[in-house]
Amino acid sequence: MKAAVVVANEDVQYQEVEEPQVTPGHVKIKVRYSGICGSDIPRVLNHGVHFYPIVLGHEFSGDVVEVGEGVTKVKVGDRVSGAPLLPCMKCDDCQKGNYSLCKHYSFIGSREQGANADYVVVPEKNAVPFADNVPYEQGAMFEPATVAIHGVFQNDYHGGEYVAILGGGTVGMFTMQWTKIFGSKKVVVFDISDERLALAKRLGADEVINTKEEGYMEKAMAITGGKGYGFVFETAGQVPTMHMAFELAANKAHVCFIGTPHENLTFTPKQW
């Protein structure tokens, strides 16, 4: 099969590789769509992988073409999306249902071969069926959509507040839409790209602000009557936006870092 293989830092090659074999409890998926996550960029450009060679890709959709022994909930022909986290299911955190806190986890497309290939094999529980009327392109967005809603749920989210979304990427757009769905006084998306901000408006943002423009902070605070934002979601994983999150926050606000930073982050005592 063909695959996009990361063979070294800054070196991705389109190669012919051996097809993965189905094992008990696993399913083989013919990949239709596989997204490039922001976290994949440092994996390719900044020595961010665990080993070479590796096939990235953890946001994907496709068709089940083969099932292993013992598989009962997924069948050949099912249209599925992939859930990439592979918790150990044995540690204290897993036993409490806190799978994202597992310290012994694996991850499809990072610690295991991923979906930037013709086929990928995953555990049955990580293949999530979706309806025939859902396009494969949308099915591949399952993972970032759940990342966003997890961040919202972890912050005791409630409506009636001003909400700031820092970063207009995929996860930022989903976070904006979830907070709109669950109710908000006004949701404002912040980014440095006018193109992304225009998309945010089309997808439902009440206001958008380009943080490269002079006076953006005054404009942002004016929207809230000077009180700040009750919920601030940082989704870009960048040091400047993580600092900005606290500047925008109202008293007793919820500040959530969904984005993953790849540089050292420090705060002054005054900022904290």
Can you say where each PLM-predicted feature lies in the sequence?
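Short Gly/Pro-enriched turn/cap motifs at secondary-structure boundaries
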Residues: V7, E18-E19, F51-G57, I108-E112, ...
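Glycine-rich beta-strand-centered segment in the early N-terminal region that forms part
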Residues: P20-S34, H47-D92, A131-N133
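Cytochrome P450 core scaffold surrounding the K-helix E-X-X-R motif
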Residues: S39-R43
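Short glycine-centered segments of the SAM/dcSAM-binding site in methyltransferase folds
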Residues: R79, Y162, A253-H254
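NAD(P)H dinucleotide-binding glycine-rich loop of Rossmann-like/cofactor-binding domains
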Residues: C88-L166
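Mid-domain Rossmann-like dinucleotide-binding core that forms the NAD(H)/NADP(H) cofactor-binding site
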Residues: V134-E214, E218, F233
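Glycine-rich cofactor phosphate-binding loops and adjacent beta1-alpha1 units
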Residues: N155, A198, L203-W272
